[in-house]
Amino acid sequence: MWWASRARWLFSALLDVGGVGLRARRRTASSGLEITGSCGGELQGELDRFGGISVHLSRHRTLHRLDAAAFRRLLQAAIQQWRAEGRIAAWLHIPILQSHFIAPAASLGFCFHHAEPHLSTLTLWLGEGPSRLPGYATHQVGVAGAVFDVSTRKVLVVQDRNKLKNMWKFPGGLSEPGEDIGDTAVREVFEETGVKSEFRSLLSIRQQHRSPGAFGMSDMYLICRLQPRSFTINFCQQECLKCEWMDLESLARTKHTTPITSRVARLLLYGHREGFDKIDLSMEELPAVYTGLFYKLYHRGLPERYKAEMGTD
C-alpha cells in the first residue's frame, strides 16, 4: 500500500532527530547542511525538514522538579515561541513515568498520536487550516503458512484452543515489527506445530475493517505457501487443540473450516494440478528510492523478456 508506506515515511521523517542543545538543529536529507533555529522557552527539541519540532521530555532532566501547573506554563510559553517562529507542528514525547504532564499538554490542545510500551507521543498542529500530520499505523498484519507437501498432497492444519468454534485453519499469527511476511509465516508455523518450513510464495491477502481482534482497527491477513522441511508434529498445546497433516482435497471439502481456509485449499489444488505459477505471488527484493534501503515486491511471475525489454523500477 503506497499510501501507508508514504505515511510511515513521513511520520519517521517528522521524528528525525539531530543533536540536542539550547538551539535545535535540522539536517537536510541530501547535503547534510545544518539549519538552526531556537526552541521556545526552556524546552529543547529538534526541527525536522517539514518545519515541525520534536521535544523528548526524557532529555530534560530538570522537569522532575516541576508540577503539572509549572509544566503547563513552560509548555504554553514554548508554543507561543514556536508559533512566532513559524513552526507547523509540535511532537511531544512523554515517558510513562512522566504521564502527569499529559493532562496539561492536552489542555493546551495536544492530542494523542500513538503510544509505545514506555512512551506516548502527542501532537499539536501549529500551521494554518486542518492538521496535515500523518496518522499512525492503520492496520495490524497477521500471516499464516499453508505448508503443502506435494508428494503426499497433504497440508498442515491446526485448531485453535481459544476459539469459540473448533475450525481447521492454517497455523499463523501476528507479524513482528520489521519482520518480513515469509519470515513470519515460517516462524509462526514452527512455534505452533514444531514443523520447519521454507517460504515459497504469497497466496492471498484479506483485508477486514473494524476487526475485533485488532482493537477495532483494520486487519490484514496474508496466507503464504510454504514447503515443508520436516514432518514430525510437536504442536504447542497452549495455543492449539489439534494439529495434523490433512489431505488437501478433504480440507477443501470439509465444513469444519473457515471460508478463507477453504478458498486457499482450492487455490492449492488448482496450483498443484495446473502449476503453481498460476497462483503464486512471488517475492523479489528490489532497491528502494531511499539510499541503502530495499523492499520486497510480491507479484505474479514476469517473463524475463519483459524485464529486459521494459527495464525495472
From Swiss-Prot:
Keyword Mitochondrion: yes
Keyword ATP-binding: no
GO biological process, one term: negative regulation of cell cycle
EC number: 3.6.1.-
Gene Ontology terms, MF aspect: ADP-ribose diphosphatase activity; NAD binding; NADH pyrophosphatase activity
Domain Nudix hydrolase: 138-270
Gene3D superfamilies hit by this protein: 3.40.630.30, 4.10.80.100, Nucleoside Triphosphate Pyrophosphohydrolase
InterPro entries: Nudix_hydrolase (IPR020476), NUDIX_hydrolase-like_dom_sf (IPR015797), Nudix_hydrolase6-like (IPR003293), NUDIX_hydrolase_CS (IPR020084), NUDIX_hydrolase_dom (IPR000086), Pre-Nudix (IPR040618)
Disulfide bonds: none
Motif position, Nudix box: 173-194
Other facts: This protein is coded from a FGF2 (BFGF) gene antisense transcript.
Protein name (database record): Nucleoside diphosphate-linked moiety X motif 6
Organism: Rattus norvegicus (Rat)
Gene designation per UniProt: Nudt6
